[in-house]
């Protein structure tokens, strides 16, 4: 039997005896999108070269790609990722982000060709992606509410106009959200992470945010090329009593 180091080459950090920074093991979706995450998470080629396509990741990514391709069988308009702390929720969202924003080019990345074959589609559809990361999000000029932020990411100023005049205080209805999807003029992928963290920090917005998510679910169901993926914790360590009631 060959020595293990001849069969599996250790990563460069191990070979060099470099001390590990625990922060490097935590992925933050907002940093991936902003381009400030560590290179292994920020660069899609490196990200996929070091990603293990588990059954859960293959299933979720396959369903999302099929939906963005216009398929309605073996897929879903809204998906929830519910795992224990450290179970890979944000890693899955980052994988979906890299796939959707790179489109056809993503087929060149490690493991993606096999993913496409398993999903029964030929290419990765390029999509408009909007991400909401609850532990990073706070109101700012131009994104006074989560739905304004999402609309702006999908369709710029036109998307915000489609929400109507009440968007700064009131969650949009399904018709307004459908107009935003049409203004995006591409398949639409919506990623939600750390939602409960946001609600804990902005409890005055909880009712309106809940209405937004409900209406978004209905609007997404009404399109054949749009999907929303929402991560939620399973572990009580990550939730307060109020979180569990809201969830």
Predicted regions and their residues:
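Walker A/P-loop-proximal flanking segment of P-loop NTPase domains
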Residues: 1-87, 94, 99-100, 247
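Flexible phosphate/Mg2+-sensing switch loops adjacent to catalytic phosphate-binding sites
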Residues: 75-78, 97-133, 160-171
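ATP-binding Walker
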Residues: 87-88, 106
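Conserved phosphate-binding/catalytic loops and adjacent sensor/switch elements of nucleotide-binding enzymes
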Residues: 92, 136-151
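Conserved P-loop NTPase catalytic core
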Residues: 118-119, 125-140, 218-222, 227-247
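Conserved P-loop NTPase "ATPase switch" module shared by AAA+ and STAND
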Residues: 133, 180-206
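Substrate-gripping "pore-loop 1 plus following alpha2 helix"
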Residues: 173, 203-215, 242-246
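Substrate-engagement module of ASCE P-loop NTPases
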Residues: 176-181, 209-229
